[in-house]
Amino acid sequence: MLQALLTVSLLLSPVPVSAIKELPGVKKYEVVYPIRLHPLHKREVKEPEQQEQFETELKYKMTVNGKIAVLYLKKNKNLLAPGYTETYYNSTGKEITTSPQIMDDCYYQGHIINEKDSDASISTCRGLRGYFSQGNQRYFIEPLSPIHRDGQEHALFKYDPEEKNYDSTCGTDGVLWVHDLQNIARPATRLVKLNDGKVQKHEKYIEYYLVLDNGEFKKYNENQDEIRKRVFEMANYVNMLYKKLNTHVALVGMEIWTDEDKINITPNASFTLENFSKWRGSVLPRRKRHDIAQLITATEFAGMTVGLAFMSTMCSPYHSVGVVQDHSDNLLRVAGTMAHEMGHNFGMFHDNYSCKCPSTICVMDKALSFYIPTDFSSCSRVSYDKFFEDKLSNCLFNAPLPTDIISTPICGNQMVEMGEDCDCGTSEECTNICCDAKTCKIKAGFQCTSGECCEKCQFKKAGMVCRPAKDECDLPEMCDGKSGNCPDDRFRANGFPCHHGKGYCLMGACPTLQEQCTELWGPGTKVADQSCYNRNEGGSKYGYCRRVDDTLIPCKTNDTMCGKLFCQGGSDNLPWKGRIVTFLTCKTFDPEDTSEEIGMVANGTKCGHNKVCINAECVDIEKAYKSTNCSSKCKGHAVCDHELQCQCEEGWSPPDCDDSSVVFYFSIVVAVLFPVAVISLVVAIVIRQQSSREKQKKDQRPLSTTGTRPHKQKRKPQMVKAVQPQEMSQMKLHVYDLPVEGNEPPASFLISKPDFSPPPIPAPRSSSFLDSNPKA
């Protein structure tokens, strides 16, 4: 039937030949001749090259391993985010940013038809180039001729399982979770608690920014088109991998340092990562909105390292970064490293023996091999889900806004752009019953197509809770009856008491000394005595309030609780370089990198009755937040939020907060259903008692030895043992004869330095991907 419907040419048999090109891990290839299957009538096939450029789906037929295989490909419409930009520099160093209208139609993903476990990442720009799997076998395909025509010869590389060779190791087997100690007052990325708690069901969007250094520019003969094609193919592969986690990786921008490197890049991967992190945090946010940035470098890192990233820092303004060495001509090996380092940003550990990998090798395997990673292990999936429970992850749930998109709107690309109400893809792809796929408009008679306040294509009633309060410093958000979207997240007014009076709310958080001690030193830590904090009046590096250049400013008497953080107990295994200083019952940390305020009391911390720390000063709450009696100015059942705006209490409809019909309706429902539930429960108990009596009577009868049916035994639920991450080993060096500053009493010092040298930053822990291979 398929043959009758499609215009097909016969395939020549594949001809095995000896390898004439040398690729990492590949000894030989065979020649195949992919034939494109055209689903059009002959009279419609007039300009195949032009038609292919715009087709959403493609099929290619070829002989693979002696059998006919049909490769189904679907265009990756989200490879480039709307508003994609490219930045380069002219000979004078002037920055030039463009928004090229790139037709990324030649980048596809798909699978082999009728194969249960199969996937593919293919570029059709100049023949077929990329990866696909068939069963347990992985293949790489690329054209042998520069001439693009149907049926041209391609090299098909087969990766032999017997050639698998773990000749590389990773030095970060014992990575610890590290909490972000950046200023908690920053509300840009706030913890997301999904209502149903099932992160897997929600689509995530990673806005991906790639920077290529000057060495890369020269490595590819200063040919920006060649670099672009290579980068797009790598990004396409990374996107294919993360789609398995219901996550879209869209390239929002690419930057090439065409004149010179903007940072100091050295073989020391940690040093390079730290420099790139600082450059990214100070330069990129003003240029382009993005969630993560990676540097691709031609510099060979020292030892076996080919990649490095901070641990569990996705969405962080400075540390959501990674550096990757362009270590192989095989771009998919480099793409695998890019995906691996991104995994560390999501808090994924390296896979160990207890992890279940559904493919030959998974993304977070600790070593590079001849295989390209094709999936995530069970451990990686658990770590990924945990990231969304514990970390700041808002940036991954916000798809680009229509007003942020500067490219020409295209209906059917699954991105809502200017002039569109919705975009559910093509008519074949669309599953949204509220959206007209042909016009990208809401269907007649409907009000909305999606959102927390949209139900069955209609707005939910005003006052219905769409985002419950997460904690005592948060406020619930209610639908307004005019939109399908839930309003922006709002918090309690800054200065609202929390943690049983131990703190005051600030931007949705409740900063306390105890919380900060636990974050720094781990469980079992407690806040040190007041006498320890009095040392902040000394103005030494073991007790001060502020740092101005290299000068340490002592605390005033009233501000001692707002300077250096002093704690008791806890662990001495810290992930940062520096000195652990202990005297009497006081313990503090002196970081090697003074640019980050590790070990200082955070803004918003309570320092007295109705007083909080702001910029190392203990000030009145009213002076700090100007929120006193704010709620008294709100009308109806409303309270003040963190921006001193009035917001309705739960169950009261905006904007006036005087309509409780939602609460009244709920009360009626409860009043009706409660008696019904009670009656149902009583009936169930009576029936159960009667059944029990009948069963007892039957049990008293003699048992027959014939004609009995075996009872099906209920399986006992198996206990799943949780696998704990290995503890990080640390090299500890005791230093005894350190000079004592001023009248400081003798103190014991402990230099905390991981055996793997991470960048000296606060919360994030760096994690590397190592390759002992000669750089391929």
Swiss-Prot record:
Q: Where is the composition biased (Basic and acidic residues)?
A: 691-701
Mark the transmembrane ranges: 667-687
Q: Where in the cell is it found?
A: Membrane
Free-text comment on the cofactor: Binds 1 zinc ion per subunit.
Glycan-linked positions: 268, 275, 352, 558, 603, 629
Top-level taxon in the UniProt lineage: Eukaryota
Give me the disulphide-bonded residues: 315-395, 355-379, 357-362, 466-486, 630-640, 634-646, 648-657
Keyword Disulfide bond appears in the UniProt entry: yes
Describe tissue expression. Expressed at high levels in epididymis and at lower levels in lung.
Q: Name one GO biological process term.
A: proteolysis
GO MF terms held by the record: metal ion binding; metalloendopeptidase activity
Q: Motif Cysteine switch residues?
A: 168-175
Which segments constitute the Peptidase M12B domain?
204-400
In the Enzyme Commission scheme, what number(s) does this protein have? 3.4.24.-
What are the binding positions for Zn(2+) in this chain?
170, 340, 344, 350
Active site residues of this protein: 341
Briefly, what is this protein's role?
A: May play a role in the adhesive and proteolytic events that occur during lymphocyte emigration or may function in ectodomain shedding of lymphocyte surface target proteins, such as FASL and CD40L. May be involved in sperm maturation.
- The name under which this protein is listed is Disintegrin and metalloproteinase domain-containing protein 28
Give the species: Macaca fascicularis
